[in-house]
């Protein structure tokens, strides 16, 4: 069975992760004690992807929880599904990272990382055929960003051929937690570009907008935002957990979505959007679902896909529906909006269909797109970074932990290169490349 090992780090990562497990347990019919109480064989058919079956028929999540302070983990442990995790898999320090990337990556985090890696190894040995890792973290704080990226690079060393998928919450433009977010995020992106295979980009502002505009919630709480994220996470992985007509795994997803190795930052969307309390009263049709999925207002990161072009995209539909209709709708989207897709990658939209819809819905869809417009987000963080770094503001917190200014400069230029690469492929056309080759051939003669 192709297992996925889930790792969550820092406050944000642990809160999203806890929500994710609530959703997954619900879909697979696992109750708060880890016992199966569902009603469909489909729920158990590929349950090994995320769960290890322990003695007495209990299902234990393949999850590692880490943080540099005990607070968030205590609340996970006392939450509705806190009892199903392996107690040894909670790894935490006492000092906290104080929103400082350097503490998470070099000092405090580095002291704790070996005990995290021990747990990761133990979980990996429990797998028949480990498919890859998924990491939940935010890039604005200290633990999720600093220690999260440290762990990713260590896992990369030890398991170089396994997929590394991250769900990364970027700092949002208007809603800021910490003044040093741009530093932490830039240093993290510097790591993610090199060491992760696929990054699902989320950000609080886009989630706020969705809650506000689409779900009509006056004051969205983090619980509501995390509910949206967990719906998306569950959708991205549903093809792996349930049988379906067109299945995919992490590697297939990567092969279809990543035309160039560095450009692996994806926008995600989910349809139909519902708030936690309300369920949809009428079933959506495949065309409606498709339309909502591709809607720019549905994207969970603050970048507008209409400002760029899609290099590739993938859609996972869930529920009983005709594959033919799905294919027709996806083709329809591409034909009507052909200017938003690069023409030098033909058939760049892949769809998969999975039989099990999420709880309480007849059908749903998850969208993952590799769009050049995501550069808007990197650009925004980069501008904030430069504004502070030019004056060396707050740098002493980082140099005090043994970091060098050089590292900041490198991270900054790596992020700017990334933006430039996205721009280059946004402007590229099929003919232009071809002309250049012809000219080169002529010169060679």
UniProtKB/Swiss-Prot annotation:
GTP binds at residues 11, 69, 138, 142-144, 204, 226. Keywords: Cytoplasm, Cytoskeleton, GTP-binding, Magnesium, Metal-binding, Microtubule, Nucleotide-binding. Its cofactor is Mg(2+). It is found in: Cytoplasm, Cytoskeleton. Mg(2+) binds at residue 69. GO terms for cellular component: cytoplasm; microtubule. Gene3D superfamilies: Helix hairpin bin (1.10.287.600), Tubulin/FtsZ, C-terminal domain (3.30.1330.20), Tubulin/FtsZ, GTPase domain (3.40.50.1440). InterPro entries: Beta-tubulin_BS, Beta_tubulin, Tub_FtsZ_C, Tubulin, Tubulin/FtsZ-like_C, Tubulin/FtsZ_2-layer-sand-dom, Tubulin/FtsZ_GTPase_sf, Tubulin_C. Residues 421-445 are annotated as: Disordered. Its main location: cytoplasm. GO terms for molecular function: GTP binding; GTPase activity; metal ion binding; structural constituent of cytoskeleton. SMART domains: Tubulin, Tubulin_C. It holds the Pfam family Tubulin. Residues 429-445 have a biased composition (Acidic residues). It comes from the Eukaryota. One of its GO terms (biological process) is mitotic cell cycle. Tubulin is the major constituent of microtubules, a cylinder consisting of laterally associated linear protofilaments composed of alpha- and beta-tubulin heterodimers. Microtubules grow by the addition of GTP-tubulin dimers to the microtubule end, where a stabilizing cap forms. Below the cap, tubulin dimers are in GDP-bound state, owing to GTPase activity of alpha-tubulin. Dimer of alpha and beta chains. A typical microtubule is a hollow water-filled tube with an outer diameter of 25 nm and an inner diameter of 15 nM. Alpha-beta heterodimers associate head-to-tail to form protofilaments running lengthwise along the microtubule wall with the beta-tubulin subunit facing the microtubule plus end conferring a structural polarity. Microtubules usually have 13 protofilaments but different protofilament numbers can be found in some organisms and specialized cells. Belongs to the tubulin family. This is Tubulin beta-4 chain.
């Amino acid at each position: 069975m192709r297992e996925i090992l889930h790792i969550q780090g820092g406050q944000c990562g642990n809160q999203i992760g806890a929500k994710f497990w609530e959703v997954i347990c619900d879909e697979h019919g696992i109750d708060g004690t880890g016992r199966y109480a569902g009603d469909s064989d489909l729920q158990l058919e590929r349950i090994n992807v995320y769960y290890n079956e322990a003695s007495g028929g209990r299902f234990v999540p393949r999850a590692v929880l880490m943080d540099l302070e005990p607070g968030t983990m205590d609340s996970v442990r006392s939450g509705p599904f806190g009892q199903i995790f392996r107690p040894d898999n909670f790894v935490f320090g006492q000092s906290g990272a104080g929103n400082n990337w350097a503490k998470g990556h070099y000092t405090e985090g580095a002291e704790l990382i070996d005990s995290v890696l021990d747990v990761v190894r133990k979980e990996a040995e429990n797998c028949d055929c480990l498919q890859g890792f998924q990491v939940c973290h935010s890039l604005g704080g200290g633990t999720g960003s600093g220690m999260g990226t440290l762990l990713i690079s260590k896992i990369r060393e030890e398991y170089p051929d396994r997929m590394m998928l991250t769900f990364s919450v970027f700092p949002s433009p208007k809603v800021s937690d910490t003044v040093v977010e741009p530093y932490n995020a830039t240093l993290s992106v510097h790591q993610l570009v090199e060491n992760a295979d696929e990054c699902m980009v989320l950000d609080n502002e886009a989630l706020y907008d969705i809650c506000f505009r689409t779900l009509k919630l006056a004051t969205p709480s983090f619980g509501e935002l995390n509910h949206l994220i967990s719906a998306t996470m569950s959708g991205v992985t549903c093809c792996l957990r349930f049988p379906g007509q067109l299945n995919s795994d992490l590697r297939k997803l990567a092969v279809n979505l990543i035309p160039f190795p560095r450009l692996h930052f994806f926008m995600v969307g989910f349809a139909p959007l519902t708030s936690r309390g309300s369920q949809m009263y009428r079933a959506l049709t495949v065309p409606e679902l498709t339309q909502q999925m591709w809607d720019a207002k549905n994207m969970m990161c603050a970048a507008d896909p209409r400002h760029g072009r899609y290099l590739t995209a993938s859609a996972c539909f869930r529920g009983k529906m005709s594959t033919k209709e799905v294919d027709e709708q996806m083709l329809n989207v591409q034909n009507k909006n052909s200017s938003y897709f690069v023409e030098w990658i033909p058939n760049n939209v892949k769809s998969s269909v999975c039989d099990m819809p999420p709880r309480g819905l007849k059908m749903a869809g998850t969208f993952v797109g590799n769009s050049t417009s995501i550069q808007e987000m990197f650009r925004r963080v980069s501008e904030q970074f430069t504004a502070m770094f030019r004056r060396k503001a707050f740098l002493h917190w980082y140099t005090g932990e043994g970091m060098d200014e050089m590292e900041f400069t490198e991270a900054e230029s790596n992020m700017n290169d990334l933006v430039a690469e996205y721009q280059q492929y946004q402007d590229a056309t099929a003919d232009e490349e071809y002309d250049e080759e012809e000219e080169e051939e002529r010169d060679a003669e």
